[in-house]
Swiss-Prot record:
InterPro entries on file: Aldolase_TIM, Indole-3-glycerol_P_synth, Indole-3-glycerol_P_synth_dom, Indole-3-GlycerolPSynthase_CS, PRAI_dom, RibuloseP-bd_barrel
A GO term, aspect molecular function: phosphoribosylanthranilate isomerase activity
Enzyme Commission number: 4.1.1.48, 5.3.1.24
Entry protein name: Tryptophan biosynthesis protein TrpCF
GO biological process terms on file: L-tryptophan biosynthetic process
Pathway linked to the protein: Amino-acid biosynthesis; L-tryptophan biosynthesis; L-tryptophan from chorismate: step 3/5; Amino-acid biosynthesis; L-tryptophan biosynthesis; L-tryptophan from chorismate: step 4/5
Keyword Lyase: yes
Keywords: Amino-acid biosynthesis, Aromatic amino acid biosynthesis, Decarboxylase, Isomerase, Lyase, Multifunctional enzyme, Tryptophan biosynthesis
Superkingdom as given in the UniProt entry: Bacteria
Subunit structure: Monomer.
Length: 477
């Protein structure tokens, strides 16, 4: 079967997509002259990494992740000026089910030369993300060692799709079939697509609607075969979105939100695992365990009367054990002391767990390094029945809502009434107090930014229990 679809003529009244496809047809024509298929076809070998097997592992409970290498886009312009593929791939290899690489030159500043550079570093299948309209591009993608291609049903008709998909399969490659509306989703099902991507971005005007994947999967729920995997594409910026959409999607393709973050490793961890903290760390092996299980933050307690208090010397050893974002916990201590510890340990944040006033916080903010956040614990009595009375302080980046008993603030091992959490501040609240494997699912359901774990994952004060840590994080993501 030959492709008869003419890509040199406008595909519809679309603007951005139409222009990209018209330019792509010109690019293909020029590339074929510059590097004819006859020069490299005989050197092509089939892929030995299965894209389908890698994505088949994705479930609603444990989604698959296609993490993307993207320098720029039409909607955002330049996203990552320091586009170091070696650095990016060395992060992605620890978390991805597959790695996507943009190869469109004009609109995304991509290049086919990027593909083998990434594939040499990662063990996962590599996806060539481009506007595929010709057999030449499919051969070229495999020549550059990719394991899967993207076929967009907003671009190709059914005849073209079959030709390109069949060719990809004959070369051992998989296909990510992209849809963006009901008609395209129906076509994907009829074409027998194994991995169906739902692009939440409107390619005509570049707006994003995360409800698209929800609406399409619900409407066609009875038509989607059990072995087909649904991938949500575009618009994913945080773990809360993952948690909401994994009910309908088996995986996520994430690019722009990661590429725009200089701290790529923690950006990936934040999206996949959420913003969760394990506090009261006293042993290097525990720091490693909580990092490996998905914690983003590690809490080091400097409050004098805590059973989990550490010295500066101990803390200096702990912060080298794993690249957590470390948070120092202080209680009614002098500003000079807090600033000294924060500076020497290069803390990500200082957490105030005492009666620190707004004036104290303002003064602390002026003396702390600019990139060190201030977190404030709000202690809620375990017997409390009325709403928490406090005013949001703009100098506070995160609130820790924790349990308080008559004798103790924090580390009580008890929960408070979670219905008292202010709904309008959940986006900057981390929930603490008695969270354990037994109640972590209910804690997640409160919809806070993240969870703060301590005594609920310990075997004794300051000693984390590896199995409890594993059980909690298994429920979190």
């Amino acid at each position: 079967m030959m492709i008869t679809q003419d890509f040199t003529k406008p595909i519809d009244s679309a603007t951005v997509l139409q222009k990209i496809v018209l330019d792509k047809a010109q690019w293909v024509k020029a590339k074929e002259k510059e590097f004819p298929l006859s020069q490299f076809k005989q050197n092509i070998q089939n892929s030995d990494r299965s894209f389908y097997d890698a994505l088949a592992k994705g479930t609603h409970q444990k989604p698959a992740y296609i993490l993307e290498c993207k320098k720029a886009s039409p909607s955002k312009g330049l996203i990552r000026a320091e586009f170091n593929l070696e650095e990016i791939a060395n992060v992605y290899k620890h978390y991805a089910s597959a790695v996507s690489v943009l190869t469109d030159e004009k609109y995304f500043q991509g290049n086919f030369e990027f593909l083998p550079l990434v594939r040499d570093i990662v063990s996962q299948p590599v996806l060539c993300k481009d506007f595929m309209i010709s057999e030449y591009q499919v051969y070229l993608a495999r020549y550059y060692q990719v394991d899967a291609i993207l076929l967009m049903l907003s671009v190709v008709n059914d005849e073209t799709y079959r030709v390109l998909a069949d060719l990809a399969h004959s070369l051992g490659m998989g296909v990510l079939t992209e849809t963006s509306n009901e008609e395209e989703f129906e076509r994907a099902l009829a074409l027998g697509a194994k991995i169906i991507g739902v692009n939440n971005r409107n390619l005509h005007d570049l707006t994003v609607d995360l409800n698209r994947v929800v609406e399409l999967t619900k409407k066609y729920a009875d038509c989607i075969p059990a072995d087909v995997r649904i991938i949500s594409e575009s618009g994913i910026y945080n773990h809360k979105q993952i948690h909401q959409l994994q009910k309908v999607a088996h995986g996520f393709l994430i690019g722009s939100s990661l590429m725009g973050n200089q701290d790529l490793n923690n950006a990936v961890r934040s999206v996949i695992f959420g913003e969760n903290k394990v506090c009261g760390l006293t042993r290097a092996q525990d720091v490693k365990i909580v990092y490996e299980n998905g914690a983003l933050y590690g809490g080091l307690i400097f409050a004098e009367h805590s059973k989990r208090s550490v010295s500066l010397r101990q803390a200096q050893e702990l912060v080298t054990a794993a690249p957590l974002r470390f948070v120092g916990v202080f209680q009614n201590q002098e500003i000079d002391f807090i600033v000294k510890i924060a500076s020497q340990l290069q803390l990500y944040a200082v957490q105030l767990h005492g009666a620190e006033t707004e004036a104290f916080i303002t003064a602390l903010r002026q003396q702390l390094p600019k990139n060190t956040q201030i977190w404030k614990a709000i202690s809620v009595n375990t017997e409390a029945q009325s709403a928490v009375d406090f005013t949001d302080d703009l100098n506070v980046d995160r609130y820790i809502f924790d349990s308080q008993t008559a004798n103790q603030q924090g580390g009580t091992g008890k929960t408070f009434d979670w219905s008292l959490i202010p709904e309008n501040l959940k986006h900057k609240i981390i929930l603490a107090g008695g969270i354990s494997p037994n109640n972590v699912e209910q804690a997640i359901a409160q919809g806070c930014l993240g969870l703060d774990l301590n005594s609920g994952v310990e075997s004794s004060a300051g000693v984390k229990d590896q199995e409890k840590v594993r059980l909690v994080f298994n429920n979190i993501y």
